[in-house]
Amino acid sequence: MFPKKNRPMIANGDRVLKDAFKDVGKYIELPARRAFLQRSMTLGGLSLLTGCAITDDESVESALLAMSRFNNCVQGWLFDPNQLAPIYPESMITRPFPFNAYYGDDEVREVDAASFRLEVSGLVSDKHAWTLDELHALPQVDQVTRHICVEGWSAIGKWSGVPFTTFLRLVGADLDAKYVGFKCADDYYTSIDMATALHPQTQLTLSYDGQTLPARYGFPMKLRMPTKLGYKNPKYIQALFVTNSYPGGYWEDQGYNWFGGS
């Protein structure tokens, strides 16, 4: 399942902050990583970086949010828009592929294909609503990639759909904008940076493992990004928008890392 909505109060500030610094340190190449960790793995180091007085749980929580924002910057800085995630042979596909959402399998949203329209708005020149037939008529590509969940598990699947960079160019999106946001039929929402949106493996997925995308995996479409953790891959997409205003996200607004790189 997704991370729990109500997180426990942080009681051991030193330990949690050290873990947070280690997470950030993963994204910094040696030798800079050593210097970062040596200078930062104390409450005083965090105070210098965030400007917070670390004296109680509330301050620790605020500091961790500041660290998450810092982590976003580090991940964005290190993200290579041309570096491909690993591709796997079809013999390694996980069958059945796991279902995962913030609700149970028996609560999967059913979307009517005939009436479905993908709404496109924001900094785009073509704002017409797309039918499923129009979307399926666009050139499709396959990828066999690994889905990595923030909870620690992973699974390999075969996803087919429209390269998102192709779609963004087709609708005349402002490719210099900062964000692309998504709204979904299950009330989920999230957003990504433009560099990830233009990554060659970011895909508007319409099919899974040779069949129309099943409802449990996000019919009528999901966004597949092997460069992001699972919670950044929205399902049941109904609307997308291009913007320079930070859109947030369902889990991100509850404290989870916004960049969410895998």
Swiss-Prot record:
This is Putative protein-methionine-sulfoxide reductase subunit YedZ1. Part of the YedY1-YedZ1 system that may repair oxidized proteins containing methionine sulfoxide residues (Met-O). It comes from the Bacteria. Keywords: Stress response. Belongs to the MsrP family. Induction: Part of the SigF regulon, induced by chlorite under positive control of SigF. Part of the probable yedZ1-yedY1-mrpX operon. PANTHER family: BLL0505 PROTEIN, PROTEIN-METHIONINE-SULFOXIDE REDUCTASE. The lineage of its organism: Bacteria, Pseudomonadati, Pseudomonadota, Betaproteobacteria, Rhodocyclales. Pfam families: Oxidored_molyb (PF00174). SUPFAM superfamilies: Oxidoreductase molybdopterin-binding domain. Disruption phenotype: Growth somewhat inhibited by chlorite. InterPro entries: OxRdtase_Mopterin-bd_dom (IPR000572), OxRdtase_Mopterin-bd_sf (IPR036374).
